[in-house]
Each structure stands twice: as structure tokens, then as C-alpha cells.
Amino acid sequence: MALLQISEPGLSAAPHQRRLAAGIDLGTTNSLVATVRSGQAETLADHEGRHLLPSVVHYQQQGHSVGYDARTNAALDTANTISSVKRLMGRSLADIQQRYPHLPYQFQASENGLPMIETAAGLLNPVRVSADILKALAARATEALAGELDGVVITVPAYFDDAQRQGTKDAARLAGLHVLRLLNEPTAAAIAYGLDSGQEGVIAVYDLGGGTFDISILRLSRGVFEVLATGGDSALGGDDFDHLLADYIREQAGIPDRSDNRVQRELLDAAIAAKIALSDADSVTVNVAGWQGEISREQFNELIAPLVKRTLLACRRALKDAGVEADEVLEVVMVGGSTRVPLVRERVGEFFGRPPLTSIDPDKVVAIGAAIQADILVGNKPDSEMLLLDVIPLSLGLETMGGLVEKVIPRNTTIPVARAQDFTTFKDGQTAMSIHVMQGERELVQDCRSLARFALRGIPALPAGGAHIRVTFQVDADGLLSVTAMEKSTGVEASIQVKPSYGLTDSEIASMIKDSMSYAEQDVKARMLAEQKVEAARVLESLHGALAADAALLSAAERQVIDDAAAHLSEVAQGDDVDAIEQAIKNVDKQTQDFAARRMDQSVRRALKGHSVDEV
């Protein structure tokens, strides 16, 4: 499915040279960076072979550290070790203090009420902290790819608002990165599994990370992912599994509840190791604080079953919000390291009635999807696989009376773009309007591509031409077209979304453009004829209404002359002679001028009846 691949002037001296791009999963607990090499998307590891980068930054007066080194300082220097900064992104200080009252950091408010974290390196905002994490990931990618990145795609939760998304973009710019796109995390996961090119329908993305749980219900339609509903629990994750198991081991080992921090750390490390082992083994031997014991998968499942049930309750709520049933879900994508737990996979499969997709490492799946998207956006895909574009390849418009296409956004317009145009009603008392969205370069509907239809209802019942409907076409950076129709006096509106690029190949686009040139003269003549026929129909419609209301203003002879002129116009309007139709319209206008003047006089007299000259 090809669209036009655009190379901007000056972007590259060698247009066929492969550009370097990366996908970044900027996570709450851990972050990853991935790229496409030799046609395969893969996450990039550090010098020690570790793919995950803990989303932790430790600040000192002389500098900072990111990742594993920073995480070791979390307990030693709490105030200067910032973790889970993603939770703070795009929030005011008041909001943060209300949501997270137990954070170990000291905050100050900036002039506009945004949070500033007090550290040994000075006052830092969440954008700066996120930028330091992004710099570390970018450095890993630059070293692995032996060159500077041309662009990145960064993933964000589907529920992130504009402020949180803008904060993420600002962090990337501060890190010196060119953001090709922000991509919703569930969409990235679906792309990693190739679901964007598969069958249409509903997809669930079950994301159980270390500290949070998110469920997203998506609808894939014509190559577009629409987020139907999101839900989850910001205080539920794999860390809770670890703490439950650590408490169980402590009880079994008879370790006092308030033992020292070293023993608590040892307990937690043992619990994490046991949890990981129980994903493959039926039982595991645990050694901690001089105690040795056996823990079975069954015992572990009993401990975590209530937490897994909580995630499924959130899934049920999200499905209800989306207005779909569990058995309507085509695929379930698993994201987050905690989805490796067998009980989680089992219960999710039972809930949705199908085995979830687990073939891609759930820690890496979001970053891999982002890398695939980045590779496309930076221009590395061959033409036959290009799905995203920087200009509109074919004009977008609406069907108007007479089967004509009114172009609203011409082809080769750069995106994102928004254009609006006003339309009006054709008939007296018209209270609804059918909006038919078209794509193509030809003048007639029959020669263009139909994209979508929707109706605007609730238009005030006014004379023809009295209502004014503003139709707005908006194409975002992903090539997603939104069309909104609004009646200006009442504000009533309707809208639809569609992806114009879906299902078109380069050859089809080229053919449509070539046809528009080959048939240009013929199309202009056809349009002129259609326009005259529409005008003839409008004139006759208006005349019939006037005669029905005020025929008494005419003598029999006058009425006959007008009827003859109207009959002649009706007859020639059935033919293909543009000039004859135009002359017949002019003749009707000439024969009805006196009638129109009398109707106007009558309307004025009615309006003035009962009023004095002074009142006027």
C-alpha cells in the first residue's frame, strides 16, 4: 500500500542512503530504545547486554547518572534520586501533591505553578529529568548505529492529555532529538504484531508493568487505530506481586516484621527471583536470612489471584465504556514484564475467550512497534510499503448538488492542515444535510473515490440558502482526516474520521492524477453542464414555491407566460446544451421580474401593517 514518499530539499545529499531512526518506550519504571536493522526491529542493549534502562536519575552537584547506577542510590540518597518521573509529566504542583502525597522529594512551584524538584544539581522540572533519560537512550542508539539519529518516535500512554504529550515533546527537544511522532503505547504494541495491516475489528492491549496497569480497547478500521476506551489502576503492578511474595516468605521464615533494611532488601530480591523462576518451574527453592524453603507456583497463584482479578475488573469496565463485548475482541496483546506470569496469561485468555499474543517479549513490544513506525516515518521503507506521508497525494472534497465535487484541500498540500468552507441548504425547510467525503482530481463524483458519508441533522427549517453550514477538513500528522460539519447559528454538528491513504497504491494515485489531466477539458465541460442543471433546478424549485404562495398577484396571461418559460427551462435542463440551459434560466428570470417585485412590495406592506411612520 504505497503513498508518495517525500524527500524535502536539503534533507539528504544521498536520498537512497538509509537514515537512522529509533523508537523509544519512555516508561514509568523502565525505558527502552529500539531500531530496525536488516529489516528486523530490535531493542538495543548497553555494554553489559541489558536492554532495559531503569527510568531513574540521580543528581549530584557535579553531574548525574541514569539507569542502574542511579537506581543503586535510591535508598542511599532518596531526595536526589528521581524515579517514575513520567507520573509527574504535564501536571501542576498542586495536582502532584494531591495525587502523590508521599513522594520523598522536596518541591517548589515555578511562577506558573509547575513543579520544580529540589536536587543537589539545583531546581529541576520533570521535563528536564525526562530529557536526561532520553539522552541516555539516544546515546545508546547513536553508539550502536554509529551515527546521529535523524528522528525518533516516542510512545506515550493513550490517556496522556495535551499537556503531558507536549511535555514529552519538550523533553525530547531538550535532549536534542527530532520527534517524528508521538505514538500511543497500545497502538505501538499492535503495530509490533503487525495488526495494523490485518483484519479490521477490536483489539485489547493488556499492559501490566512494574507499578501500573493499563487496559486499552482499540478499533482498527481502514488502517486507523481508534482508541475506544482506556482504564486501569495506577497503583497496581508487578511490584505488588513481589511484595506479596516477600511478605509470604517472611512469614514462612519467621523473620520479624520490622527487621532491618538489609534483610528487607534480601527478602524482596528473593521474592523477585522466585517469581521469575516460577514462570517456568512448578516450584522453586528459596534461601533467605538462613532459612530455606520450597514455594510452589500454586502457592504464588493463590497470593496474586486477587490482584489479577482487579485487572480483569478494569478490563470489564473498559469494555463497557467502549460499548463492546469480550467475545468481540479479535486479538489481545500482552505488554509489560508482569504479563509473563502464567496465571496472568491464563486468566486473561479465559476472560477474552482467546489466547493472548505473547510471542514478542512483553518488555520490548512497545519499543519495537515504535521502531517500526520510526523507520517508516524517516523514509527508509520502499515505496511499496509506505503508509505515511508528508503531503496529501490526492485532493479531498465534498459532493455538492448535481454530482459535483467541491475540492476543500487540494493535492500536494503539506500536512498537518485544516481548511474550512461554508455551504448552504438547497431546499426550503431543509433540516438535514448528507455529507459525502470524496478524494480525487476529477470534477464529478462518479470519477472520484468515495471516502465516507455522514449526516448533519437538526438544521433550522429556513428558506433555501438560509442556513449556513461550515464544513472543516482537518488532516493530522498521521494522515488521519477528520471532517466536521456545523450549522453556524445553532452550533449543532456531526463528524467522521477516515484515513485517505488506506488501500491506495502509488500506481493508483498516479493513474488518478493522469486521468485528471487527460480528461481535464472534458471534465470542465461536464462540470459546467452540471452546474447549470443545478441552477436550473434551484430556479424552478424557488419559482414553484413562489407561485404556490402568491399566484394571486398574477393575471392569467402573466401566469401563462411564466409557466411557458418554466416549462421550456425544465425541458432544456434535461439535455446537454449548456448555453441553452443558461439562456432558459435568464428567460425565466426576465419573465418573473415583475412578479418578484410585487411579492417584495406585498411583504413590505405586511411588515408595516399596524405600525406608524414614526415607528418605522
UniProtKB/Swiss-Prot annotation:
GO terms for molecular function: ADP binding; ATP binding; ATP hydrolysis activity; ATP-dependent protein folding chaperone; heat shock protein binding; protein folding chaperone; unfolded protein binding. GO terms for biological process: cellular response to cold; chaperone cofactor-dependent protein refolding; iron-sulfur cluster assembly; protein refolding. Induction: By cold shock. Disulfide bonds: none annotated. One of its GO terms (cellular component) is cytosol. Belongs to the heat shock protein 70 family. This is Chaperone protein HscA. It comes from Escherichia coli (strain K12).
